[in-house]
Swiss-Prot record:
Alphabetized InterPro entries for the sequence: Actin (IPR004000), Actin/actin-like_CS (IPR020902), ATPase_NBD (IPR043129)
Disulfide bond residue pairs: none
Principal location listed in the UniProt entry: cytoplasm
Family indicated by similarity: Belongs to the actin family. ARP3 subfamily.
Primary role: Functions as ATP-binding component of the Arp2/3 complex which is involved in regulation of actin polymerization and together with an activating nucleation-promoting factor (NPF) mediates the formation of branched actin networks. Seems to contact the pointed end of the daughter actin filament. The Arp2/3 complex is involved in organizing the actin system in cell motility and chemotaxis, in phagocytosis and macropinocytosis, at late steps of endosome processing, and in mitosis.
Gene Ontology MF terms in the entry: actin filament binding; ATP binding
Signal peptide: none
Organism listed in the record: Dictyostelium discoideum (Social amoeba)
Name of the featured protein: Actin-related protein 3
GO cellular component: actin cytoskeleton; Arp2/3 protein complex; cell leading edge; cell pole; cell projection; clathrin-coated pit; cortical actin cytoskeleton; cytosol
Residue numbers carrying N-acetylmethionine: M1
Subcellular localization(s) per the UniProt record: Cytoplasm, Cytoskeleton; Cytoplasm, Cytosol; Cytoplasm, Cell cortex; Cell projection, Pseudopodium
Alphabetical UniProt keywords: Acetylation, Actin-binding, ATP-binding, Cell projection, Cytoplasm, Cytoskeleton, Nucleotide-binding, Stress response
Classification via PANTHER family: ACTIN
Amino acid sequence: MNPASGLPAVVIDNGTGYTKMGYAGNNDPSFIIPTTIATQSSKGKQTAASQKKGVEDLDFFIGDEAIANSKTYDMTNPVKHGQIENWTHMEQYWEHCVFKYLRCEPEDHYFLLTEPPLNAPENREFTAEIMFETFNVPGLYIAVQAVLALAASWTSKNAEKTLTGTVIDSGDGVTHVIPISEGYVIGSSIKHIPIAGRDISSYVQQIMREREPNIPPAESLEIAKRVKEQYSYVCPDIVKEFGKYDSEPDKWIKTINAQDSVTKKPFSYDVGYERFLGPELFFNPEIASSDYLTPLPKVVDDTIQSCPIDCRRGLYKNIVLSGGSTMFKDFGKRLQRDVKRSVDYRIKRSEELSGGKIKAVPLAVNVISHNMQRYAVWFGGSMLASTPEFYNVCHTKAQYDEIGPSICRFNTVIGGIN
């Protein structure tokens, strides 16, 4: 808690699709809302009152309210592919998060915000300026999302309390594979995958449009999201899975009844192959597009192989899943199996090429799934910000006033306060 006010720190994780916010020490975020803002249309007619200087800056909505007002307001996403792109909208978004949702006085709470890997130092400076000058917070810590996700995995029974591991963070807009050694991100080995939740939704929508003419066009994306979140899973073998559906359609294909939100007429649709074809994009991306062809298990293996040799064993042993797009049933099992195959094949080839002279030590591959996986980044931040040491490593308002925003270019790594 804040040594001065005795109040817990505020933890905000701004993702591409959703923002998670709440107070340190809690297991779950207090609010989860879309990272969307609806501002007054510049083309639309403004009332006489709103034309007064500055009033239009207050006329905006965020989250679900923004979506509800999307017909009369311009709706934008301030965060794209994990990076903040519109700082004016981001400041407005944080304003509503703090005052409307959390209903707190920012002067009384330390703040923990999250950032993607390889975030530009200038972005940290912009964040510091907004937090210290607009909100007048007493202290700020900007944590790397992957490190927080690694800490959150400690809740798993199979996890060791180590800050060495490989984090696969897959949300709505982007998927990162991030190796971490003793709390430090190995930046040169980070890899990005242009496949995430939004791409799976679009692919499922495309399949269902071709097969289900009953689905109203206006409903197709929401139905695709529902299928992705409620019915999808990862299969061990795509060819065998097609055979199961063809031989026993009544067992595997589900019929869903729904209602058109516009006409209120009922309609129904079948959920079939897309149940496993959506998540299959991670393991066989060529089924949707020829633009990107590298499966996730190969990216994970290549990432670890590009790291210093003395930390690779620990990176294979602790592969941690984070984000909503890793929540598919059996996602971890399939990933562990495929990565293990690559590792075992390489070891076998090494022995063959040495003529049997080199006997490699077996390498453990372990993929960690846990209960806090969906909101792992926020939960890791909640754990960190609830420790007394957290307040010792935060950048304070006094330091900011003395030195300036450049103090936030660097943050003490979580490993230093473990």
